[in-house]
């Protein structure tokens, strides 16, 4: 198998070509068939999270151990020299790079992962989320889940609903979809949480067909994928949040006219934007999607740390 991403930083989904994304996705299927392997034998990977995480951190850790590797690091900065002694972020990354074969970074500030890659002494850096900017490994597992359920990544009708303004998963996924052919994206959000202009510019440049809508009812008969994200309460005042959130809650009744092949994806965690009653429908795929994060992250780590696969 040709390895396109050996020793490569993965900071933005735009760092990966369509060919590279497809390569990772195809490789991920092999890990779903056989999760335990030795691709990361004798490899040490640093997990440096300065922002809360459950699925991303634990799936990365599981991916490392299942592939024979070892991980070190921290899940917050409270007991590090960053917090206690005022050490700079770039010094922290520079030192950590001396101990490991790869560094996985999550940070609340946009651009932090890119900065880490500039001070990692040629040790590959993976962005596990930087502010409202990018979350490339989540996007690849989203694409994997779409291909797994639809059998393709082209010629699809995809609705994205919720927080389009601040959600890094939405920003990454929208850019990734633009690399594939003849997809149409239906964006559904409150006007206060609309897609950033730079994402719209990318879609325009790539000639992606897209439209904006006020409710899921407008598009439910057309779509193959419904990607829903939580409204980020921490970004809004309480009254604004309550008003917006109440309008974007997906219920089982909203799916009455859905196509049989529709699958609902969610990067999780959810708040109340996705009713628990939806979990029992044939459309729900977000828990399988979360599981797929394990296999995709095994494929990514194995690829960047092995010249030959």
Swiss-Prot record:
L-aspartate binds at residues 85, 168, 230. GO terms for molecular function: amino acid binding; aspartate carbamoyltransferase activity. It is an enzyme of class 2 (transferase). Keywords: Pyrimidine biosynthesis, Transferase. The keyword Signal does not apply. The keyword Transferase applies. One of its GO terms (biological process) is 'de novo' UMP biosynthetic process. Pfam families: OTCace, OTCace_N. Catalyzes the condensation of carbamoyl phosphate and aspartate to form carbamoyl aspartate and inorganic phosphate, the committed step in the de novo pyrimidine nucleotide biosynthesis pathway. This is Aspartate carbamoyltransferase catalytic subunit. It comes from Wigglesworthia glossinidia brevipalpis.
């Amino acid at each position: 198998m040709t390895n396109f991403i050996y020793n490569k930083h993965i900071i933005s989904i735009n760092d990966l070509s369509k060919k590279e994304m497809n390569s990772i996705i195809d490789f991920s299927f092999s890990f779903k068939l056989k999760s335990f392997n030795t691709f990361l034998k004798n490899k040490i990977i640093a997990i440096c999270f300065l922002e809360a995480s459950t699925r991303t951190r634990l799936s990365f850790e599981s991916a490392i151990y299942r592939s024979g590797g070892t991980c070190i690091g921290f899940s917050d900065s409270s007991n590090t020299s960053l917090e206690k002694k005022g050490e700079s972020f770039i010094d922290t990354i520079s030192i950590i790079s001396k101990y490991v074969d790869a560094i996985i970074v999550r940070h609340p500030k946009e651009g932090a992962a890119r900065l880490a890659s500039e001070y990692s002494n040629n040790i590959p850096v993976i962005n596990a989320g930087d502010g409202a900017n990018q979350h490339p490994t989540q996007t690849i597992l989203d694409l994997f889940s779409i291909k797994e359920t639809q059998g393709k990544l082209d010629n699809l009708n995809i609705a994205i609903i919720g927080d389009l303004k601040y959600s890094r998963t939405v920003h990454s996924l929208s850019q990734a979809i633009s690399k594939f052919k003849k997809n149409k994206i239906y964006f559904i959000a409150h006007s206060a949480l609309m897609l950033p202009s730079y994402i719209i510019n990318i879609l325009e440049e790539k000639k992606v067909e897209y439209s904006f809508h006020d409710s899921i009812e407008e598009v439910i008969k057309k779509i193959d994928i419904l990607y829903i994200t939580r409204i980020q309460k921490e970004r809004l005042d309480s009254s604004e949040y309550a008003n917006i959130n109440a309008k974007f809650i997906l219920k089982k009744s909203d799916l009455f006219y859905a196509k049989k092949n529709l699958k609902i994806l969610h990067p999780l965690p959810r708040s109340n934007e996705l009713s628990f009653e939806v979990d029992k429908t044939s459309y729900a795929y977000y828990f399988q999607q979360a599981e797929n994060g394990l296999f995709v992250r095994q494929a990514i780590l194995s690829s960047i740390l092995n010249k030959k696969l």
